[in-house]
């Protein structure tokens, strides 16, 4: 259940009973200090100011009308009008027992399910995926998982770069290599070197460059031979991306790919409609939409070119066509874009033009969720030692290799299990190190920090889960099916039970704000509270009464299930042991 929402509804009802207008919020939040209870409602002060009454007296009248019998052991007023709510241990135990028996652990949101399009990853198929693609791929995938978990219909869209002038050069190079007897899969086995070879060929061979430019025209006009070569290139490049997605445990599949080329037939119509509405006007031969809404400090409108002087289209045109498709064909209520912060103005422009042209209904939520950059120790964007782009595949391989060296310390593991654990730890460490940082900030990439089993890291959370699994193995019990009465007596038990129950609140917040680090911080706090509980409250010691032992096992099982579920929503796998 969502405790915060449950309590907020009760406090809001009491506020209404004492004559406070409904537009005043209870301002209910988790208390920052144990002495202030478990939750705190601060709405009386804002209401009292507007109503010109004493806030403490108003808070008292709210408390007098507040029905929390059987829920709170104590409700008290502190300071100028804070309402501190101390929850009953027995009530917490009942709620945890009920939530643990459900498949999802967390009550799904009561809001009506929406159709949500999530645009993420979207690599350029001309090149191999590099570290710059990591953040969009894993942050977007985390939100897609969470929104689905909350009951929304999620439509993933991998808006790959599969069109443009560079493809003339690449198709010409592929044709050359195929004429030498190579198969497409072999010729393109290393996309990076293939691209460099094609570029060098283009720069040094005038005849090749002429052919490449001709192939762009033939591609755009639908020449079947050129289209076949383009399809071969796309197929092999997408296969490279899918291998990365599989290794990253990302849910994107071939069915989610809808590249730039998918909108080619709609681009002329987009420009025509913008012209018909008087939004697009000719400027130096190009078609431009001038947005006064995004004017600069001098008052000059922001120009959005939708068609070049030579008749060609731009990213803005394609993105407008994609928006029309997503709100029309896909019937999206909400569209989330996970694109880095450098594209913020572009996304603002596209959203503004789409609204003005009525390409999207007014109720559709258009959201650009930007993110910062992965930095090296030198404070510059993460590169190889030679200053080149780091291939994502090589980064992930190194993560698994480094993790295997850590896992090798456990001599009880056979080779296959050790390799599986190393993969989960290495990939999980990379993903968690990224997801646990505030999305909008840059962060410094550090191997030692991310692979540590101490602190707010992926390996630490995976270890916390295996620690609980080992308790059940030692007790010769099945964690998933174990059942017993849950009783809460110790402070550490209450803190752990309360934190476990707050999972639903956290997931709902992440779904709304698209900030995965909030879930990461929650899981770290939960793991830390479990370690504190484990030290203070013995479970399997011989002098522990059976009912206490079983109760603590039930509590531990709830924590393990919550950890596994939370990590799964982050796209991180758990293991039986480490």
UniProtKB/Swiss-Prot annotation:
GO terms for molecular function: arginine-tRNA ligase activity; ATP binding. It is found in: Cytoplasm. GO terms for cellular component: cytoplasm. PROSITE patterns: AA_TRNA_LIGASE_I. A motif ('HIGH' region) lies at residues 123-133. Disulfide bonds: none annotated. It comes from the Bacteria. It catalyses: tRNA(Arg) + L-arginine + ATP = L-arginyl-tRNA(Arg) + AMP + diphosphate. Its EC number is 6.1.1.19. Its main location: cytoplasm. The keyword Nucleotide-binding applies. Keywords: Aminoacyl-tRNA synthetase, ATP-binding, Cytoplasm, Ligase, Nucleotide-binding, Protein biosynthesis. One of its GO terms (biological process) is arginyl-tRNA aminoacylation. CDD domains: Anticodon_Ia_Arg, ArgRS_core. Belongs to the class-I aminoacyl-tRNA synthetase family. Monomer. This is Arginine--tRNA ligase. It comes from Teredinibacter turnerae (strain ATCC 39867 / T7901).
């Amino acid at each position: 259940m969502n405790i915060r929402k449950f309590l907020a509804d009760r406090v809001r009802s009491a506020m209404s009973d004492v004559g406070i207008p409904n537009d005043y919020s209870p301002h209910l939040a988790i208390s920052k200090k144990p002495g202030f209870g478990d939750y705190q409602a601060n709405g009386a002060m804002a209401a009292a100011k507007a109503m010109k009454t004493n806030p403490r007296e108003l808070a008292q009248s709210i408390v007098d009308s507040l029905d929390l019998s059987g829920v709170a052991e104590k409700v008290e007023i502190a300071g100028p009008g804070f309402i501190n709510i101390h929850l009953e241990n027995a009530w917490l135990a009942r709620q945890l027992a009920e939530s643990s028996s459900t498949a999802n652990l967390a009550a799904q949101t009561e809001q009506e399910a929406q159709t949500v399009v999530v645009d993420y990853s979207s690599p350029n198929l001309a090149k191999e995926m590099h570290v710059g693609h990591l953040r969009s791929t894993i942050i977007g995938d985390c939100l897609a998982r969470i929104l689905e978990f909350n009951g929304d219909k999620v439509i993933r869209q991998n808006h790959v770069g599969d069109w443009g002038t560079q493809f003339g050069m690449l198709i010409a190079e592929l044709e050359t290599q195929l004429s030498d007897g190579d198969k497409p899969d072999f010729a393109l086995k290393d996309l990076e070197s293939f691209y460099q070879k094609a570029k060098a060929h283009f720069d040094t061979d005038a005849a090749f460059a002429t052919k490449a430019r001709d192939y762009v025209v033939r591609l755009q006009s639908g020449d079947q031979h050129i289209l076949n070569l383009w399809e071969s290139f796309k197929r092999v490049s997408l296969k490279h991306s899918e291998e990365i997605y599989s290794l990253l445990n990302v849910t994107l599949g071939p069915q989610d790919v809808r590249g730039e080329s998918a909108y080619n037939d709609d681009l002329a119509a987009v420009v025509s409609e913008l012209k018909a509405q008087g939004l697009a006007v000719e400027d130096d031969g190009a078609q431009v939409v001038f947005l006064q809404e995004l004017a600069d400090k001098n008052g000059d409108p922001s120009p959005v070119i939708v068609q070049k002087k030579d008749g060609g289209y731009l990213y803005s045109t394609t993105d407008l066509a994609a928006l029309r498709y997503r709100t029309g064909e896909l019937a999206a209520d909400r569209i989330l874009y996970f694109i880095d912060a450098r594209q913020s103005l572009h996304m603002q422009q596209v959203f503004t033009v789409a609204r003005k042209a009525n390409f999207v209904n007014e109720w559709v939520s258009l959201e650009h969720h930007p993110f910062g950059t992965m930095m090296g120790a030198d404070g510059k964007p993460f590169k190889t030692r030679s200053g080149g782009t780091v291939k994502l595949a090589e980064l992930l391989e190194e993560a698994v290799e480094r993790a295997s060296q850590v896992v090798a310390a456990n001599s009880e593991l056979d080779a296959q299990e050790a390799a599986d654990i190393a993969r989960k730890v290495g990939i999980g460490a990379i993903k968690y190190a990224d997801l646990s940082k505030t999305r909008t900030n840059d962060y410094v990439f550090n191997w030692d920090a991310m692979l540590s089993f101490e602190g707010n890291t992926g390996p630490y959370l995976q270890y916390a889960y295996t620690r609980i699994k080992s308790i059940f193995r030692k007790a010769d019990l099945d964690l998933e099916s174990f059942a017993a009465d849950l009783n809460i007596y110790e402070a550490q038990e209450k803190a752990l039970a309360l934190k476990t129950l707050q999972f639903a609140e956290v997931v709902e917040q992440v779904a709304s704000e698209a900030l995965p680090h909030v879930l990461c911080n929650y899981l770290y706090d939960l793991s830390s509270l479990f370690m504190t509980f484990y030290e203070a409250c013995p479970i399997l010691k011989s002098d522990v009464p059976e009912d206490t032992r079983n109760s603590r096992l039930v509590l531990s099982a709830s924590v393990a299930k919550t950890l596994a579920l939370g990590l799964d929503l982050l796209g991180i796998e758990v293991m039986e042991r480490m």
